Amino acid sequence: MEPPDARAGLLWLTLLLSGYSGAQAELHVSVPPRVEVMRGEQIALDCTPREHPENYVLEWLLVDASGARHRLASVEPQGSEFLGTIHNSRGRRPPYKIDSLGRLVIAEAQVGDERDYVCVVKAGAAGTSEATSSVRVFATPEATEVAPNKGTLSVMEQFAQEIATCSSNNGNPVPRITWYQNGQRLDVPMELNSKGYMTSRTVREASGLYSLTSTLYLRLHKEDRDASFHCAAHYDLPSGQHGRLDSHTFRLTLHYPTEHVEFWVGSPSTTEGWVREGDAVQLLCQGDGSPSPEYSFFREQGNQEEQLNVNLKGNLTLEGVHRSQSGIYGCRVEDYDADEEVQLVKKLKLHVAYLDPLELSVPEEFSVFLNSSGTVVNCSARGLPAPIVRWTKDSVTVADGPILSLDSVTFDSAGTYTCEASTPTVPLLSRTQSFQLVVQGAPELKPNEIKPKSGTSWTEGDEVMLTCSARGFPEPKLTWSQRGDTTPAEPPFEGRGWMSSSLTLKVTSALSREGVSCEASNIHGKNGHVFHFGSVAPQTAQAGVAVMAVAVSVGLLLLVVAAFYCMRRKGRPGCCQRAEKGAPPAREPELSHSGSERPEHTGLLMGGPSGGGRGGNGGFGDEC
């Protein structure tokens, strides 16, 4: 078997000899002019003669950076198949290969495969032709990284300062970097100038990939203190596509002088600057410079300044502020970079509101007499600002001002009186003080009038409940003129201090004449009331019923006695019958059961113990 190179040589010789056998024809070769793939993908380069000659040989040549050509492989058609030969892979891993369709296969494309590949077709008499296919390998860069300047940048600098450096690594082709401020693209040139510019540097890595770094320089202003910055890397993809990778956003630390100072009371206060005595009061001072300067707090004492505190936070707390701490306070911003025209000292006047405990001109329990007048109670309220005073009783205002006048005092006047003092300009600053008014006097009595059940008059035996209510001080005692079922009762009247007693009894004729009285008494006197019942009707209907009941009872008793007698006289027939008839028959001899003329118990029905009952007046007129 001949080696491949020998066979190829014979084929070339055959094609060369056949080229002289006839006229040379024109030959055309078809290859993809540009092949674009992502790094790591496979490339298959196809080369086809358009005229389809019967015998031909094609070769793949690699054009290096200097333009020199290097033979990589050759392909011979054998019927419907192709015989490929790799002549030189030039150290590539994995090496080139020819597939079953006669294509040059470049596996796992790398950036180094970006070359021109020339396909040369030799077809003997048909001629020789070639075509070039350019391979482009794209690689997406790594995530975009930004390194901001972590120092403090001064807005007073007259030149652009370094803002940040942005990096986009290992991409192909070389990516492009743009800068953004607050989401808007910055149009900065590459040339050095005082307002802003950027520089860039490209590095080709050992892998053949490219890394790009860009540094941004800007002249900063105070308005940039809250600005956000970021960068973005733009890269190309196959088929004219593009990609973008944004970095994270960042902010800068700027140094700028103070232009304005504010000083105010931070804790709850009124618009007039009042604060409550005893509260923790915060004084806040704020300058708009950066970084935060020192704040010096002081209090004016005549023509002198009393130094209170120096800090970087800009706040001063007065714990449990006292009325003596009212006065003028100041804050000084220690910023030596500030313009001379800037007012770095601010002052305010602190007003400490207070309200002393209220003082009443009467003790906590105060007594007056019923119907008295001219009593005055004074409520003394001292505070700043001047408090407003009013008197209330049962949450109802009874007097405006510190003076409470008690005139025409009644028992309803008794109760709890409260003096309320408040300062409308200072919320929650208020005080109260109360006293108990006691009204002394003879009892006041109120009866609960009653009406007959029938509506017009009382009937003897009706049950009635009488109620008397009284009030006074000391508490009165309620007594009744009649005995009965006495119980405490709920007062039926509205008002303060009432007490009640109820008496339950039956109506009689005697009550109608005398009446029933209740009396309330205490050390100051007594008061009474008599309940009258008017005429009391007798129980007529009930008397008739009683008489009838007695008559029926007597009749029943007589019948029982008669029945008993008849039972005793069963031995004498006709006796009871004669007794039932009106006239006695002619007398006949009487025989007892024992045969004697006189029965043993005859005396039971006779008028006397002698038994002489015949025609006598002491019995029922007959033995029967």
From Swiss-Prot:
<feature type="domain" description="Ig-like V-type 2">
    <location>
        <begin position="141"/>
        <end position="251"/>
    </location>
</feature>
<dbReference type="Pfam" id="PF13927">
    <property type="entry name" value="Ig_3"/>
</dbReference>
<feature type="disulfide bond">
    <location>
        <begin position="166"/>
        <end position="231"/>
    </location>
</feature>
<feature type="domain" description="Ig-like V-type 1">
    <location>
        <begin position="26"/>
        <end position="136"/>
    </location>
</feature>
<keyword id="KW-0675">Receptor</keyword>
<feature type="disulfide bond">
    <location>
        <begin position="47"/>
        <end position="119"/>
    </location>
</feature>
<keyword id="KW-0677">Repeat</keyword>
<feature type="glycosylation site" description="N-linked (GlcNAc...) asparagine">
    <location>
        <position position="378"/>
    </location>
</feature>
<dbReference type="GO" id="GO:0001525">
    <property type="term" value="P:angiogenesis"/>
</dbReference>
<keyword id="KW-0812">Transmembrane</keyword>
<dbReference type="GO" id="GO:0007160">
    <property type="term" value="P:cell-matrix adhesion"/>
</dbReference>
<feature type="disulfide bond">
    <location>
        <begin position="468"/>
        <end position="518"/>
    </location>
</feature>
<feature type="topological domain" description="Cytoplasmic">
    <location>
        <begin position="565"/>
        <end position="624"/>
    </location>
</feature>
<feature type="modified residue" description="Phosphoserine">
    <location>
        <position position="594"/>
    </location>
</feature>
<feature type="region of interest" description="Disordered">
    <location>
        <begin position="574"/>
        <end position="624"/>
    </location>
</feature>
<feature type="transmembrane region" description="Helical">
    <location>
        <begin position="544"/>
        <end position="564"/>
    </location>
</feature>
<dbReference type="Pfam" id="PF13895">
    <property type="entry name" value="Ig_2"/>
</dbReference>
<dbReference type="Pfam" id="PF08205">
    <property type="entry name" value="C2-set_2"/>
</dbReference>
<feature type="modified residue" description="Phosphoserine">
    <location>
        <position position="592"/>
    </location>
</feature>
<feature type="compositionally biased region" description="Gly residues">
    <location>
        <begin position="605"/>
        <end position="624"/>
    </location>
</feature>
<keyword id="KW-0130">Cell adhesion</keyword>
<comment type="function">
    <text>Transmembrane glycoprotein that functions as both a receptor and an adhesion molecule playing a crucial role in cell adhesion, motility, migration and invasion. Extracellular domain enables binding to extracellular matrix proteins, such as laminin, integrin and other ligands while its intracellular domain interacts with cytoskeletal proteins like hemoglobin, facilitating cell signal transduction. Serves as a receptor for laminin alpha-5/LAMA5 to promote cell adhesion.</text>
</comment>
<dbReference type="InterPro" id="IPR003598">
    <property type="entry name" value="Ig_sub2"/>
</dbReference>
<dbReference type="InterPro" id="IPR051116">
    <property type="entry name" value="Surface_Rcpt/Adhesion_Mol"/>
</dbReference>
<feature type="disulfide bond">
    <location>
        <begin position="285"/>
        <end position="331"/>
    </location>
</feature>
<dbReference type="InterPro" id="IPR013783">
    <property type="entry name" value="Ig-like_fold"/>
</dbReference>
<keyword id="KW-1015">Disulfide bond</keyword>
<dbReference type="InterPro" id="IPR013162">
    <property type="entry name" value="CD80_C2-set"/>
</dbReference>
<keyword id="KW-0325">Glycoprotein</keyword>
<feature type="glycosylation site" description="N-linked (GlcNAc...) asparagine">
    <location>
        <position position="315"/>
    </location>
</feature>
<feature type="compositionally biased region" description="Basic and acidic residues">
    <location>
        <begin position="587"/>
        <end position="601"/>
    </location>
</feature>
<dbReference type="GO" id="GO:0005055">
    <property type="term" value="F:laminin receptor activity"/>
</dbReference>
<comment type="subunit">
    <text>Homodimer. Interacts with ITGA4:ITGB1. Interacts with spectrins SPTA1 and SPTB1.</text>
</comment>
<dbReference type="GO" id="GO:0009986">
    <property type="term" value="C:cell surface"/>
</dbReference>
<dbReference type="InterPro" id="IPR007110">
    <property type="entry name" value="Ig-like_dom"/>
</dbReference>
<keyword id="KW-0732">Signal</keyword>
<feature type="region of interest" description="Disordered">
    <location>
        <begin position="477"/>
        <end position="497"/>
    </location>
</feature>
<protein>
    <recommendedName>
        <fullName>Basal cell adhesion molecule</fullName>
    </recommendedName>
</protein>
<feature type="disulfide bond">
    <location>
        <begin position="379"/>
        <end position="419"/>
    </location>
</feature>
<feature type="topological domain" description="Extracellular">
    <location>
        <begin position="26"/>
        <end position="543"/>
    </location>
</feature>
<keyword id="KW-0393">Immunoglobulin domain</keyword>
<keyword id="KW-1133">Transmembrane helix</keyword>
